[in-house]
Amino acid sequence: MKATDFSKVAEVYDNNSFRFDELAFDIHLEGYIHGQPQQHYNVMDLACGTGIYLDHQMGHFDAHSIEWHGVDASEAMLGKAREKLKRGNLVQGLAEDLPYVSNSFDFIINNYAFHHFTRKSQVLDEVYRVLKDGGIFKTHNINVHDMENWWIYQYFPSAYTEDLERFWQKQRIFRELEDRGFKVRLETNYQMEKLKVTDYLQLAENRDISVLTIISDDDYYAGLSKMKNDLEHNPAKTMMNDFSELVCIAEK
């Protein structure tokens, strides 16, 4: 599978407002804290990127003693995270070779990033290793197998082919976690709605969405040109859009 070069998107990554809208208060972390009362918690954002999740959650959980950790392979993305965050431990490292001793973390979150890992099975082995007994691994991602008519795929068809290679199906995610000894609960949601094409042109032009960085330039500019041509002929053009998300909670 192809990999995104995040050094090329770090500068524009946070221009996508949807990244901020989608990361609300983490009810699963709250549930873990309430269900496992203790004096101190270690929480890791695995593939933390520019620190959006950590920045959102730190304020919500000020009443608790939490040591926040962020790990990412991209120094460019971590540089943006350091600009946001006044505290927390940010480390450059690989998810398949985490720089932590075993049984270190109470809660590990992986937001919109599992598809980037080229050695996913090894990543899950590492997550299991560094997670404490009774700890939680949460992964939250789009569910591409149930959203064939996502606006991205309508204008950039080769992106769908790439994503089918990058994303595990939900059944495999469940099985891989369960085979390692996790107790797994997986939920998906789905929505179909009509979107205005004009509302998504800027997102396409920003080219921060990872799959748009790995398709060929020819495919990318062909899709962008089609969006612009459609809007030139009909500024009010709409399209039906599929969207689905997956949340998986795995308890060690």
List each language-model region with its residue ranges.
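Conserved Class I S-adenosyl-L-methionine
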Residues: 21, 50, 183-252
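A conserved beta-strand element that flanks and buttresses the S-adenosyl-L-methionine
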Residues: 109
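Short catalytic micro-motifs in class I SAM-dependent methyltransferases
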Residues: 112-116
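A short glycine-rich, Lys/Arg-flanked "PGG" loop and its adjoining helix->strand segment in the class I
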Residues: 121-136
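Short alpha-helix
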Residues: 165-180
